[in-house]
From Swiss-Prot:
The lineage of its organism: Bacteria, Bacillati, Bacillota, Clostridia, Moorellales. Keywords: Metal-binding, Ribonucleoprotein, Ribosomal protein, RNA-binding, rRNA-binding, Zinc. Binds the 23S rRNA. GO terms for molecular function: metal ion binding; rRNA binding; structural constituent of ribosome. It comes from the Bacteria. Belongs to the bacterial ribosomal protein bL31 family. Type A subfamily. Its cofactor is Zn(2+). This is Large ribosomal subunit protein bL31. Zn(2+) binds at C16, C18, C36, C39. The gene is rpmE. Binds 1 zinc ion per subunit. It comes from Moorella thermoacetica (strain ATCC 39073 / JCM 9320).
Length: 66
């Protein structure tokens, strides 16, 4: 590898909207995600629906009142 052309690779934190924090390594310091393995229904086994920010159709209807 050529010296001094690669980004710094160091400790990073992945922060989920549920409050879970995962320590890892990356070229970015903090990474924010909406869902992780602690709150995703597939991993938790719950059948509840995931809270969404709104799909494209719903946002269109809100914007144009249809």
């Amino acid at each position: 590898m050529k010296p001094n052309i690669h980004p710094d690779y160091g400790p990073a934190r992945i922060i989920c909207a549920c409050g879970n924090v995962i320590e890892t390594r990356s070229t970015k310091k903090d990474i924010r995600v909406e869902i992780c393995s602690q709150c995703h229904p597939f991993y938790t086994g719950s059948r509840q629906r995931v809270v969404e920010r709104g799909g494209r159709i719903e946002r269109f209807r809100q914007k144009y009142g249809r």
